Curated annotation (Swiss-Prot):
<keyword id="KW-0068">Autocatalytic cleavage</keyword>
<keyword id="KW-1015">Disulfide bond</keyword>
<dbReference type="InterPro" id="IPR038765">
    <property type="entry name" value="Papain-like_cys_pep_sf"/>
</dbReference>
<feature type="active site">
    <location>
        <position position="122"/>
    </location>
</feature>
<dbReference type="Pfam" id="PF00770">
    <property type="entry name" value="Peptidase_C5"/>
</dbReference>
<dbReference type="GO" id="GO:0042025">
    <property type="term" value="C:host cell nucleus"/>
</dbReference>
<feature type="active site">
    <location>
        <position position="54"/>
    </location>
</feature>
<dbReference type="GO" id="GO:0003677">
    <property type="term" value="F:DNA binding"/>
</dbReference>
<comment type="subunit">
    <text>Interacts with protease cofactor pVI-C; this interaction is necessary for protease activation.</text>
</comment>
<keyword id="KW-0946">Virion</keyword>
<comment type="function">
    <text>Cleaves viral precursor proteins (pTP, pIIIa, pVI, pVII, pVIII, and pX) inside newly assembled particles giving rise to mature virions. Protease complexed to its cofactor slides along the viral DNA to specifically locate and cleave the viral precursors. Mature virions have a weakened organization compared to the unmature virions, thereby facilitating subsequent uncoating. Without maturation, the particle lacks infectivity and is unable to uncoat. Late in adenovirus infection, in the cytoplasm, may participate in the cytoskeleton destruction. Cleaves host cell cytoskeletal keratins K7 and K18.</text>
</comment>
<keyword id="KW-0378">Hydrolase</keyword>
<keyword id="KW-0645">Protease</keyword>
<dbReference type="InterPro" id="IPR000855">
    <property type="entry name" value="Peptidase_C5"/>
</dbReference>
<feature type="site" description="Cleavage; by autolysis">
    <location>
        <begin position="51"/>
        <end position="52"/>
    </location>
</feature>
<dbReference type="GO" id="GO:0006508">
    <property type="term" value="P:proteolysis"/>
</dbReference>
<keyword id="KW-0426">Late protein</keyword>
Length: 204
């Protein structure tokens, strides 16, 4: 099942992301329309009519002209298009960010996998990343107290048996992090953990 949109919004409010959060969107997300406002969003790789497939987090930091694209699986744009028919480069072209004075911006994309291949916790990992973004926007992807709680492996090792213990520890640390910071998660922990379980895709 994974995470519901309303649930992600409640958790992000608890994490202090609310003032910067534009909302949850399907693959038709129009982009960051205001180039002068620090903002972020959680975007699904599928259309809303499908019920959703995989959550990504996107964030814009105008002071440094930095666009973040966080995928818990660490897929490249080419791989996202191949698997989900989703392109973030196309999203960038639709966005007002390309109308900046010199059209010069820095794209920082996650390239390592932090989520197991059968886990349904992608939305929760996105919440964790956005917590880091609003606090440390210049080093949101790593080298901060939030993202240091999880560890990545090269995307080509996503299915490797040697990676699964790393992913399991990441998900356990993710739940621990949310228990500390989100009253909504604490109140609904049993249901949320069942919906986003490490082996959820095997049991569907």
């Amino acid at each position: 099942m994974g995470s519901r949109e309303e649930e992600l919004r409640f958790i992000l409010h608890d994490l202090g992301v609310g003032p910067y959060f534009l909302g949850t969107f399907d693959k038709h997300f129009p982009g960051f329309i205001s180039k002068d406002r620090m903002s972020c969003a959680i975007v699904n790789t599928a259309g809303r009519e499908t019920g959703g497939v995989h959550w990504l987090a996107m964030a814009w930091h105008p002071a440094s002209q930095t666009f973040y694209m966080f995928d818990p699986f660490g897929f490249s744009d080419q791989k996202l298009k191949q698997i989900y028919n989703f392109e973030y480069q196309g999203l960038l072209k639709r966005s007002a960010l390309t109308s900046t004075a010199d059209r010069c911006l820095t794209l920082i994309q996650s390239t390592q996998s932090v989520q197991g291949p059968n886990s349904a916790a992608c939305g929760l990992f996105c919440c964790m990343f956005l917590h880091a973004f609003v606090r440390w926007p210049l080093r949101a992807m790593d080298n901060n107290p939030t993202m240091n709680l999880i560890h990545g492996v090269p995307n080509n090792m996503l299915e490797s048996p040697s990676s699964q213990n790393v992913f399991l520890r990441n998900q356990q640390n993710l739940y621990r992090f949310l228990r500390r910071h989100s009253p909504h998660f604490v109140k609904h922990a049993a249901q949320i953990e069942a919906d986003t379980a490490f082996d959820k895709m095997l049991t569907n």
